[in-house]
Amino acid sequence: MENQKNFLTTAPYKGTRDFYPEDMRLRNWMFSVMRETVLSFGYEEYDGPILESFDLYKAKSGEEIVERQLYDFIDKGERRVAIRPEMTPTLARMVAGNLRNLPKPVRWFSIPNLWRYEQPGKGRLREHWQLNVDLFGVDSHRAELEILLIADSILKKFGAPIGSYQIKVSHRKLLDSFLKNSLKLNGDQVHGVSKLLDKKSKISPEAFETEMKPFLNNFKEQFSLIETYLNSNLETVSKIPGIDTNSVSFIQNLFQELGELGIDKQLLFDPSIIRGFDYYTGCIFEVFDTNPENRRSLYGGGRYDNLIGLFSKEQLSGIGFGLGDVTLKNFLEGHNLIPNLSREKTIFLPIMDESLFVDTFKLSKELRENEILTETMLDSAKIGKQIQIAEKKGYRYVLFLGESEIRTETVQIKDLISGEQKSLPRKGLSDTLKKDFQL
């Protein structure tokens, strides 16, 4: 019996994806829509290293990320480093390092590659890309207004109809006042209760109640007040004793102006919005998919006024959000918003005969110089086989350049979808393809 060789697996690392050309077409389209939308608001793109000091995340990221999700190791220089799980700490470091030279307000965005060691599931992978949009240097609610407009505009740019998503808004000071003033909790209790509130939607009501008991002194009364808070609206929440009414007024004013700008139908006050990151200090929000098969948070963000405090004595207000590519793709698929991304906009040019290789390549060069995407075969296989390749690759239009076409200064174009084929004059060919075939 012959020895069997143990081949390496062709599967990617758990929680990651291979991006074949068809996958890259989708990813590039998603990124281009996001990028174009944010650029239209005057934002500038930035990037940073995928490796950072472990201390940066220890200081700025949430407890769950640092203790359970961080990919970290000791490098060859005996430094403890980590692969970035989020972009905000890097952003804070970069802004603080060049603070005096940056004109305010600072409007930046990025689409970085991020890593977290967590159990893969729907909408969650260990490696993903995330649009990060951040605005620094504006203290007023107009910063929240602009960020929420961008968050809304992105989904509209993808063609999302009204009702397909909902923007839920709350305020961190509202929650803090409820926990400290209304429930009269101490520091450890505040920490425990807020963590439970953040994961409430992921556990059963029974588990939520059971896990809440150790943090409450007068369970029945305090738990009843928690339920009242979670079920309140902008009118009723302000009636809870000890609540921060300034936060309520802030959200009311914000909603009024956003309504005047046409996005009131998507807005909802929801005090259960917590946002797990420890650095949020003000208004917070999450965008939710309303599809019954994918009722989950798509993305979110909020204000973080103390973000650069570890790097500088200067204060700089900031607000931003992050939108991951995995949850966005699920949303687009669930609402049938992904367009036809096949190679219909690219010409396929077979070689009719070996003697016509140079003429064929001259034609492809001419088309590309006129900004028409063109793939040219590199050998003169049987024409039927070349057509099969074009069909398999998803092309729609094939150009034929044979000896008779060269003599008559024409080309033949065939639509592989309809089967129609006709002759086109070689003169002005690029203009004809753009005008009549939308290439």
Swiss-Prot record:
Record carries keyword Protease: no
Pfam families reported in the protein's UniProt record: HGTP_anticodon, tRNA-synt_His
Annotated GO MF terms: ATP binding; histidine-tRNA ligase activity
InterPro entries per UniProt: aa-tRNA-synth_II, aa-tRNA-synth_II/BPL/LPL, Anticodon-bd, Anticodon-bd_dom_sf, His-tRNA-ligase, HisRS-like_core, HisRS/HisZ, HisRS_anticodon
Subcellular localization, as worded in the UniProt entry: Cytoplasm
Catalytic activity: tRNA(His) + L-histidine + ATP = L-histidyl-tRNA(His) + AMP + diphosphate + H(+)
Keywords recorded for this protein, A-Z: Aminoacyl-tRNA synthetase, ATP-binding, Cytoplasm, Ligase, Nucleotide-binding, Protein biosynthesis
Gene Ontology CC, one term: cytoplasm
Disulphide bond pairs: none
GO biological process: histidyl-tRNA aminoacylation
EC number: 6.1.1.21
Quaternary structure (record): Homodimer.
Protein family membership: Belongs to the class-II aminoacyl-tRNA synthetase family.
Protein name: Histidine--tRNA ligase
Species name: Leptospira interrogans serogroup Icterohaemorrhagiae serovar Lai (strain 56601)
Source taxonomy: Bacteria, Pseudomonadati, Spirochaetota, Spirochaetia, Leptospirales
